[in-house]
Amino acid sequence: MNNTAFSKLAETTIVYIVDKIEEQDIEGIIDVDLHGDILNLDTENGIYVINTQSASKEIWLSSPVSGPHHFFYEQGKWKSRIGFELMILLTEELGIRFDKCEIF
């Protein structure tokens, strides 16, 4: 994947995360703050930081629940080297449903 394709895919993914949170977090429990390619989510469990790393073509997640993760894109999913999938992890930790197929 070239840099342009990665940038577009990563941006689409982060915007998708923001849209799903705003759509489903009716009570406004999660405070969403997006600046460029850095997304901060202030939750009851702490602050999540999601950002893109163009050089390594990864999305990085810092979670107050499960710690740091690096995700690479493969076969339609953002996966970590230890087997986590970004959307499944966010669903479990945030209680927001992310339909993986909608991104692509």
Curated annotation (Swiss-Prot):
SUPFAM superfamilies with a match to the protein in the record: Frataxin/Nqo15-like
GO molecular function: 2 iron, 2 sulfur cluster binding; ferric iron binding; ferrous iron binding; ferroxidase activity; iron chaperone activity
Keyword Repeat set for record: no
Transmembrane segments: none
Endpoints of the signal sequence: none
Alphabetical GO biological process terms: intracellular iron ion homeostasis; iron-sulfur cluster assembly
GO cellular component: cytoplasm
Family: Belongs to the frataxin family.
Task performed by this protein: Involved in iron-sulfur (Fe-S) cluster assembly. May act as a regulator of Fe-S biogenesis.
Name of this protein: Iron-sulfur cluster assembly protein CyaY
Species, as recorded: Rickettsia typhi (strain ATCC VR-144 / Wilmington)
